[in-house]
Amino acid sequence: YRDYLQQRQITRETAEKFRLGATPNGWDSLYQFLKTKKINPQEMLDLGLVSVSQKTGRYVDRFRQRLMFPIGDEKGNIIAFGGRIIDKESSPQKYLNSPDTPLFHKSRNLYGLHLARNKIRNVDQAIIVEGYMDVISCHQYGINNAVAPLGTAFTPEQGKLLMRNTYQVGISFDGDSAGVKA
């Protein structure tokens, strides 16, 4: 994942600020680790960290060989994850997000809000960008009031969340079909 971050010119400091990490290619590395910590498999399922293989009936990690983006709540507590595939040949799905859980509803959260909130309030403006890497790049270059929706659309719930901090919003989505759709 370091090569990918280097290609995108993301510094180590920025990667640490956003608590970026990576998952191994193993099928059940996280599952085995959490088992040693006495975490119940049902809790792992409920939190979207593992799933049950339809082929084998065994627990498998949801995120394998991915650059990991921890998703924080308004206070910065990690409530979910987004993962970007590192090896394009290992999965057709470029991005994979945690499912909705008792702690996380993607339509009610904004990526990076816990890091951007003070700046948003200070400048009385937020900038909505398209995705994880857009937020990270903005922050790296001093645009610390950038946030992103967690999905393909900006929802009314996300709007209400943002309006607790400012009513001034700029939108900067990509010019591709996904950005236009969002």
Residues of each region from the PLM?
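Short beta-alpha connecting loops at secondary-structure transitions
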Residues: 170-174
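Short acidic/histidine-centered micro-motifs embedded in hydrophobic/aromatic stretches
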Residues: 4, 21, 47
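Non-catalytic interaction/clamp surfaces of large macromolecular machines
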Residues: 1-16
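Phosphate-handling DNA/RNA-contact segment within nucleic-acid enzymes
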Residues: 26-169, 182
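Phosphate/diphosphate-binding loops
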Residues: 175-182
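Terminal amphipathic helices with adjacent charged low-complexity linkers/tails
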Residues: 15-24
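Short linear sequence elements within intrinsically disordered, low-complexity coil regions
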Residues: 6-9, 23, 68
